[in-house]
Structures are given as C-alpha cells and as structure tokens.
A protein has these predicted regions:
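Beta-hairpin "wing" of winged helix-turn-helix
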Residues: 62-75, 81
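Basic, amphipathic "hinge/linker" alpha-helix immediately C-terminal to the N-terminal HTH DNA-binding motif
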Residues: 76-93
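Amphipathic alpha-helical dimerization/coiled-coil segments
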Residues: 88-106
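A cross-family signal for key residues in well-ordered alpha-helices
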Residues: 21-24, 57, 91
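N-terminal helix-turn-helix DNA-binding core of bacterial DNA-binding proteins
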Residues: 10-51
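Basic amphipathic alpha-helical segments that dock to polyanions
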Residues: 52-54, 58-59
Length: 106
C-alpha cells in the first residue's frame, strides 16, 4: 500500500478501502492473512504484512473481526471472520458508498 509518492490523504483513503475489502471478504468466509494479502493485491493494493496485520489486529480489537488460530499442516494460521458488529459496520459503510456513488456518477 505504501507509496511514498502518494499524499498522506490518499494513503488514508486507500487504507479505508482496504478495511472495507477486508470486511467484505471475511463476511463471505474466514480468511487468513496471506489469503487476504493476495486478494487485496488482485484489487491493486500493494501492502506489506507489516501494514496488513496491524489493520487486522485493530479491526479485531474494535470487535469487527474475530480471530481463530487453526493448525493447518503443522502451521498455526490466524483466520479472521467478521463479527455481528463488523457486519453492521459494513452495511453502514456500503450504504454511504452507494450514496456517494449516486452523487458522483449519476
């Protein structure tokens, strides 16, 4: 995500978009960090694990995600899933995005 040529406000907006993507994908099924990173890269976001994991930890500490550690092939993977509070937040955000989309593009 970090591009030192981007103004700070643009990086903050992108960080918000990334959080929305995280909520969207974890509402569909649990994801672990590497999967989320790869998914976000498909959307054009370049971010390090040093950026992603603090975002996930913050969403978890705020009660929007829950984490479950699962042993997979001898590795402990941290799977993240959206909570009820996360779904409520996601719905509020998407309502605002729809409103913004109408204003800008219609």
């Amino acid at each position: 995500m970090k591009n030192t040529n981007d103004p700070k406000i643009l990086r903050e907006i992108y960080a918000g978009f990334i959080r929305i993507h995280i909520l969207y994908h974890t509402a569909k099924r649990p994801f672990y960090g590497q999967e989320l990173k790869e998914e976000l890269e498909e959307h054009g976001y370049r971010l390090s694990y040093g950026t992603l994991y603090p975002m996930l930890a913050n969403l978890e500490s705020e009660g929007f995600l829950e984490r479950k550690d699962i042993n997979t092939e001898g590795k402990i993977r941290k799977y993240y899933n959206i909570t009820d509070s996360g779904r409520t937040l996601y719905e509020k955000v998407t309502d605002k995005l729809k409103e913004l989309n109408r204003e800008i593009f219609e």
